[in-house]
Design a protein with these regions (language model features):
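Catalytic cores of the polymerase beta-like nucleotidyltransferase superfamily
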Residues: 1-453
Length: 453
């Protein structure tokens, strides 16, 4: 296993070890090495106190009460945490008090799942033969059997940090593992504890689920665990809401369609996949029936965009991520019409934003396949995408793309800066948008004289 550890992490490890302290690689890095998966963070644990670690690493920093020291290495941070025991979790997130532990076994006892409670100790000779795994909870067996199991008492672990409820789902999703029966039953019983967790922490775990190859299965697991009822209850409202209409491809209820749209959305961006999952979230709110008694969802895209905005704010998405999700949902019902003019194509691009075109097409593919259509793209959609590509090359999508600007107007018409300049530019832009050949300086300067009369 030592061959899998990068040299910079080994240097840090050896420095602590050479100062006569115990030190171990621990947690996700050991788990992923055993799984032969990429390792992101090379976390360590030691019996050295934070003060002792700061003496070993003068450039390290320590600004928390949980014993974690950050050591900067090649633009990365390697975290080293002192052995600790924890008492009381009144906020279901952080321990009320922390005491330094004496042994690695004490430290491993406070961790969440058995597969994360394995420590790796290296001998001073850097020999792979003498690398020792400390595994008091048989985490290696659970890795082999693909099982997620809480360390010790599941109820105690989840009450210590309620995010572990969601983390169990996330790890099971990422590695396609099964959650052990006692652990699963406790998740079902304690699902409401997730309300104690901040939206930001929930969002991080949720996006990791959506980024997984098994995102579809992960969302279904969230539903089965009751966690989805508290994380995104708006999705649950779609259960049992029929969409069947004569001549329409929808055969599933709204919830199932949303989840299938996520499954078939070709984007690998978890933010776009979240938009696919939420794209019809407005349907339950606007559902009604027409004069024939058939179900309709008039303006569901508008209602859905408003609901998605609230969800994103609750989960502390960045403004940029939220606006993208809302935009995609608001306009996902765009019509693919082969008779649409080039100017109409350009208006569509401006409406959704050039940066959102590919994401909108991915959402449409997910929507189609998630609704039971057998082909990802109709001939109309393929033609529409081709026409969009053609218009993205030469088209002026804003006033700034015109062949003249405000300075040209001031110079040509000999007027002072003011609102009139913006009005003139807008008129010129609308004219050019209908006929791109007019976007040349000679023509536009001539039109200036006509517009100023």
């Amino acid at each position: 296993m030592i061959k899998l550890i990068p040299e910079e992490a080994l240097r840090i490890y050896r420095k602590v070890q050479s100062a006569n302290f115990e030190v171990y690689f621990v947690g996700g890095c050991v788990r992923n090495m055993l799984l032969k998966k990429p390792v992101k963070d090379w976390d360590m644990t030691t019996n050295a106190t934070p003060d002792a670690l700061l003496k070993i690493f003068p450039k390290a920093f320590y600004d928390n009460k949980f014993g974690t020291v950050g050591v900067p290495v090649d633009k990365k941070i390697i975290e080293i945490t002192t052995f600790r025991t924890e008492k009381g979790y009144s906020d279901k997130r952080r321990p009320d008090s922390v005491e330094w532990g004496k042994t690695i076994e004490e430290d491993l006892a406070r961790r969440d799942f058995t597969i994360n409670s394995i420590a790796l100790k290296l001998d001073a000779k850097r020999s792979t033969l003498d690398a020792i795994l400390i595994d008091p909870y048989q985490g290696q067996d659970d890795i082999k059997n693909k099982i997620i199991k809480a360390v010790g008492n599941p109820k105690a672990r989840f009450k210590e940090d309620a995010l572990r409820l969601l983390r169990a789902i996330r790890i099971a999703t990422e590695f396609s593992f099964t959650i052990e029966e006692k652990t699963w039953k406790e998740i079902l019983a304690d699902a409401s504890l997730i309300n104690e967790v901040s939206g930001e922490r929930i969002r991080i775990e949720l996006l990791r689920i959506l980024a997984s190859e098994f995102a579809y299965e992960g969302v279904l697991l969230l539903k089965e665990s009751n966690l989805l009822n508290y994380i995104v209850p708006e999705l649950i409202e779609g259960i049992g809401i029929s969409q069947k209409r004569p001549g329409r491809h929808h055969v599933d209820d709204v919830f199932t369609h949303n989840v299938l749209s996520l499954k078939f959305c070709p984007s690998t961006d978890p933010v776009i996949k979240f938009a696919a999952l939420l794209h019809d979230v407005g349907k339950p709110k606007v559902m009604s029936k027409d004069e024939e008694g058939l179900v309709i969802f008039y303006n569901h895209e508008i209602a859905g965009a408003n609901i998605a905005r609230k969800i994103c704010d609750r989960l502390k998405f960045s403004g940029k991520e939220r606006d993208k999700i809302v935009n995609l949902i608001r306009w996902h019902m765009f019509t693919v019409d082969e008779k649409l003019s080039d100017a109409g194509i350009r208006r569509f691009i401006r409406r959704i934003g050039v940066e959102n075109v590919k994401d909108m097409m991915d959402l449409r593919i997910g929507d189609r396949l998630g609704g039971g259509t057998q082909t990802a793209e109709s001939w109309r959609l393929k033609l529409f995408k081709k026409r969009i590509e053609n218009q993205l090359k030469p088209a002026p999508f804003s006033i700034n793309d015109l062949a003249i600007d405000g300075n040209d107007i001031i110079k040509e018409l000999k007027i002072k800066p003011g609102p009139k300049i913006g009005d003139i530019l807008q008129k010129l832009f609308l004219e050019v948008d209908e006929d791109l050949s007019k976007n040349n300086k000679e023509y536009l300067l001539k039109r200036l004289q006509e517009l100023s009369k």
